[in-house]
Design a protein with these regions (language model features):
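Catalytic cores of secreted/periplasmic lytic hydrolases that degrade extracellular macromolecules
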Residues: 2-138
């Protein structure tokens, strides 16, 4: 196996972490009245498909900041729920477009809007793999 092949295998495995979170994303989105595709796109963009240091060490898939830097979460699902609540809070303040959300969410909002938009398009086009539930054996 080449180094490149090994790297691609690791990146694919990390990307599948986000895909495996789709049920949690959908549930949190429905509970908070936000778009699950937007949530997944933010998570993929902010965490570089779950490969970022914050995603791996702090379960912070969404780049959510606290008072002392990036927040630490007990689980990735807890971060997903926090993101849904944050987006619902933005919506309640009239921030509904990507540009409006980006101005509150990050400092480099033009880059963020392009990245999140690209992920949203790929998710909606089915270019991001869906994880199928395991079939019980026996």
């Amino acid at each position: 196996m080449t180094i490149l092949t090994g790297l691609m295998m690791v990146l694919t495995a990390q990307s599948e972490i986000v895909t495996a979170l789709r049920p949690a994303i959908r549930e949190a989105a429905a509970k908070n009245g936000v778009d699950p595709v937007l949530m997944e796109a933010i998570i993929r963009h902010e965490s570089a498909n779950a490969t970022s240091s914050a995603a791996r060490r702090k379960n912070n898939l969404a780049g959510i900041m606290g008072r002392r830097g990036q927040r630490r979460y007990e689980s990735k699902e807890a971060c997903v729920q926090d993101l849904a609540e944050l987006l619902a809070k933005y919506r309640s303040k009239g921030r509904v477009t990507l540009v409006q959300i980006s101005r509150a969410y990050c400092s480099s909002h033009q880059h963020w809007v392009r990245g999140v938009s690209a992920y949203m398009a790929n998710i909606r086009a089915g270019k991001v793999k869906e994880v199928k539930p395991e079939t019980p054996k026996g």
